[in-house]
Amino acid sequence: MAQYGHPSPLGMAAREELYSKVTPRRNRQQRPGTIKHGSALDVLLSMGFPRARAQKALASTGGRSVQAACDWLFSHVGDPFLDDPLPREYVLYLRPTGPLAQKLSDFWQQSKQICGKNKAHNIFPHITLCQFFMCEDSKVDALGEALQTTVSRWKCKFSAPLPLELYTSSNFIGLFVKEDSAEVLKKFAADFAAEAASKTEVHVEPHKKQLHVTLAYHFQASHLPTLEKLAQNIDVKLGCDWVATIFSRDIRFANHETLQVIYPYTPQNDDELELVPGDFIFMSPMEQTSTSEGWIYGTSLTTGCSGLLPENYITKADECSTWIFHGSYSILNTSSSNSLTFGDGVLERRPYEDQGLGETTPLTIICQPMQPLRVNSQPGPQKRCLFVCRHGERMDVVFGKYWLSQCFDAKGRYIRTNLNMPHSLPQRSGGFRDYEKDAPITVFGCMQARLVGEALLESNTIIDHVYCSPSLRCVQTAHNILKGLQQENHLKIRVEPGLFEWTKWVAGSTLPAWIPPSELAAANLSVDTTYRPHIPISKLVVSESYDTYISRSFQVTKEIISECKSKGNNILIVAHASSLEACTCQLQGLSPQNSKDFVQMVRKIPYLGFCSCEELGETGIWQLTDPPILPLTHGPTGGFNWRETLLQE
């Protein structure tokens, strides 16, 4: 069970001040469409729940029912913030229903399937009418009344259908509301803001920018033609009713990453979090600095408890997956709507067992639902592919910093003391102490690499050239991939120092003393002893800047591609976790991430993490594509999904 904190005296005082304002509500007749749970509150109070907790439970479940509120309260019994007076954040959106909504849903599905996820996929199709604003739990009823009152005043003043125009730019596609209708909607939003302030004392800031439905943004430049064509297929004149809808979210997690649990987990230690499939986890990158590889620190939506959890038990979820639906009103039709027709209904917060998790949540991290790409199975001109792969499991990580003392005697002779240690190690001219900065891979690391090679063979993928970092772990991984491909006697590995990882990560004031290619070949590793590197070891410097590392990786990758042109289509680079990003980002015409985001991304790439980059014709522009093999997941290390990790949203 995770450890919990206690509210501070200041927080307790704020809570008392906030809830001192709560006054008994008079009974009112229920009206269709109102966002109201007075009778539910009375029932909860009669059951003995404190007023503040009952109001928080109703606000956190959208006032759906007494049972839902009770379930929320019981599941949050260990939540250290259960009695925190911090209110939720609310937002007012226009959402489409009817034939146009279905067309937009089709666009969402097709664009994600063809081009991968972009920022627009984080939220359902909508028009933003205001910024997020806070509202006390005790005033949510009045907020709903404010919306109903405003809609009733404006219902006959909107154009039907709402006129929309398609707009595209290099990194944005959307449907914009024509100016006259947009002005009417802005006045409607301003009227709601005034009504809400009058009834609830909240401050609502109407949306000041052009009103629009975002279709796509923050996507790869190469995807623009495809996305534009899909957007042009949307008939904006289709029948559509628009509903003014209120959603809320927990303000504490507004800037967190939203994840969803796909496998159950029972805690083994006091600081670990229990996982239930279907639950959502909030994760802040700022809280991950001290976590072990393969683990993250997060907070459960269902319980409010925080703790450590294995990274490969969860998958990314849309930002809006945890939002709460509070109610909606049609702005065009005379009937009110309390149900949403778009999407899979998760925003209505049905219990997890009713959401059809097996149908709505693809297990993208553990097992990607795709057909292997058969790179050389199609007739005609072949596209050029660059495969980048991380090395296998390394000895110093498995057996610790002082692993040498476990398997070398006083005379420097290697002695195998564990089944996961290799039978023998290559001789080093500088002595066995050179292994401290240049560790080999384990027996399991060799197996991982052979598995990848065998998978490439089964998918009919032909590798024409192999390059690798000078680190022994990378050379051994490349050699074992070739063994799995049954090419160890036909292909030679070109050891390229320019592919070494960011030298800032090397401990001490000197670079590793790598084994020369001639000695690697003498140790029966398939190394090309005649290869002349593009960036020799003498050009590498200790503690290089991030910009220098990124530039070096891009430069050597371009030179490798140029060197292999007309000599085969497919290049394999075996290097480090950072290489999957550093060697492919600028090839796609993208700007490098900042160093902080880069480091966070690298943490997510497991041993033998594998990505595929394909040239678009002969344009010199490359794009990430589905690899020809399935991902490899092992231990607590997070499974690797290239779309989620490498694609810049």
UniProtKB/Swiss-Prot annotation:
Stored SMART domains: SH3, UBA
Annotated EC = 3.1.3.48
GO molecular function per UniProt = identical protein binding; phosphoprotein binding; protein tyrosine phosphatase activity; ubiquitin protein ligase binding
Q: What class of enzyme is it?
A: hydrolase
The residue ranges of the SH3 domain are 254-319
Q: Where is this region: Protein tyrosine phosphatase?
A: 380-649
| Annotated TM spans | none
Q: What is its main location?
A: cytoplasm
Q: What's a GO cellular component annotated to this UniProt protein?
A: nucleus
Q: Which PROSITE patterns match?
A: SH3 (PS50002), UBA (PS50030)
Give the subcellular location.
Cytoplasm; Nucleus
Function field: Interferes with CBL-mediated down-regulation and degradation of receptor-type tyrosine kinases. Promotes accumulation of activated target receptors, such as T-cell receptors and EGFR, on the cell surface. Exhibits tyrosine phosphatase activity toward several substrates including EGFR, FAK, SYK, and ZAP70. Down-regulates proteins that are dually modified by both protein tyrosine phosphorylation and ubiquitination.
Q: How does it assemble?
A: Homodimer. Interacts with JAK2 (in vitro). Interacts with CBL. Part of a complex containing CBL and activated EGFR. Interacts with ubiquitin and with mono-ubiquitinated proteins. Interacts with ZAP70 (ubiquitinated form).
Q: What is this protein called?
A: Ubiquitin-associated and SH3 domain-containing protein B
